[in-house]
Amino acid sequence: MSLPTVAIVGRPNVGKSTIFNRIAGERISIVEDIPGVTRDRIYATGEWLTRKFNIIDTGGIELSDEPFMTEIRAQAEIAMTEADVIIAVVDGETGITDADEAVANILYRTDKPVILVVNKVDNPERRMEIFDFYSLGLGDPYPVSAVHGIGTGDVLDAIVQNLPNEIEEENENVIKFSLIGRPNVGKSSLINAILGEDRVIASPIAGTTRDAIDTHFVDSEDQEFVMIDTAGMRKSGKIYENTEKYSVMRAMRAIDRSDIVLMVINAEEGIREYDMRIAGFAHEAGKGILIVVNKWDTLEKDNDTMKNFELEIRTKFKFLDYAPIVYVSAKTGQRLNKLPDMIKEIHHAQNLRISSSVLNDVIMDAVAINPTPTDKGKRLKIFYATQVAIKPPTFVVFVNEEELMHFSYLRFLENQIRKAFVFEGTPVHLIARKRK
């Protein structure tokens, strides 16, 4: 189930990033930070009062070539498009500015909840000044001091009160997937090609609270698919459409809503940092992954072309050694007919359940091949293992001492499990737990 999203907006220097870090870093537990986005962390996942949500700092989306006012307007537009709840931040020291009013004027157009946060209210005397901010027309102002953590809990309470109701899990038999990649890798052509070959379009439906359009279709075997929209702002032509950080943010949202991610790479350009960042996020999120190398028809080939390209993929995507690779051409249709079946195979692997008896036979055979490690004369002892989750398949291995289970031995056990069962295309998680 995808998580609701909270976006932070406001002019520069009002403390958006400090509020983001305060919310994400102390008063809630971070479930997962995005790998590779430590320098410009704009997206985190957290929990408050048992509700999980994603939080976006639109201030991290820099549009540096644009005029000041255009930039902050764009960030407000992004929030209105992406978020379920919007936090509008203003500065309690400087008071209301033209830029604050510009943001407020844009937010008037949304029917999404807006929480007005007055930052830098560091002493009781300044609390009396927050009433001036009622003139923005954004509701009751929440006084906070992000630096000192004052008032953060009240803001989090307001966020949770305004989150959309949790919906029941969707039909597990429906396969949700998205095509992710840099601009110009050919995602649109691939989408059109996938939908154009003997597919029955069931219904284009509007996304839950956003304007994104997901596409439902069934294949010849009556398997239902949902292609998660990643275009999002097709209508826009707006200045932020091609900024890399905004592109990353949209990709992360699509990954969050997907079961399986088709990581699309341009054969002409190879793998870039963007690809590695997004692939890392999909991997950490436990999604099924299929690597799709598009525009394969454009390369001059010899006997080693495919082997060398695969070597590059496996070298740069070391953490995706389980992900299958397919070389396609949206233009010529080369190998496109393989995609639906490969997606279904990954979906099957994600949902595979292994009985404890069969699993423990594999574990004991693995220990016989490679005995458990020792540390300071004490040997790791494995009592038994059991599967506790699917999507991704997750196993708990009960041992005498968790500290004795080295990462390398867990990886060995994972490899033995992968040899015994078909888990191609999905991460497999192994967790060591001390038997009580």
Curated annotation (Swiss-Prot):
Which residues participate in GTP 1 binding? 10-17, 57-61, 119-122
Q: How far does the signal peptide extend, from start to end residue?
A: none
Q: Which HAMAP family match?
A: GTPase_Der (MF_00195)
- The answer, when asked if Secreted is one of the entry's keywords, is no
Entries under InterPro entries matching the protein: G_ENGA (IPR031166), GTP-bd (IPR006073), GTPase_Der (IPR016484), KH_dom-like (IPR032859), KH_dom-like_a/b (IPR015946), P-loop_NTPase (IPR027417), Small_GTP-bd (IPR005225)
Q: Which organism is it from?
A: Lactococcus lactis subsp. lactis (strain IL1403)
- Which family, according to UniProt? Belongs to the TRAFAC class TrmE-Era-EngA-EngB-Septin-like GTPase superfamily. EngA (Der) GTPase family.
Keywords annotated in UniProt? GTP-binding, Nucleotide-binding, Repeat, Ribosome biogenesis
Xref: Pfam families: KH_dom-like (PF14714), MMR_HSR1 (PF01926)
The record describes the protein's role as:
GTPase that plays an essential role in the late steps of ribosome biogenesis.
Q: Where is the EngA-type G domain?
A: 4-167, 175-351
Can you name this protein? GTPase Der
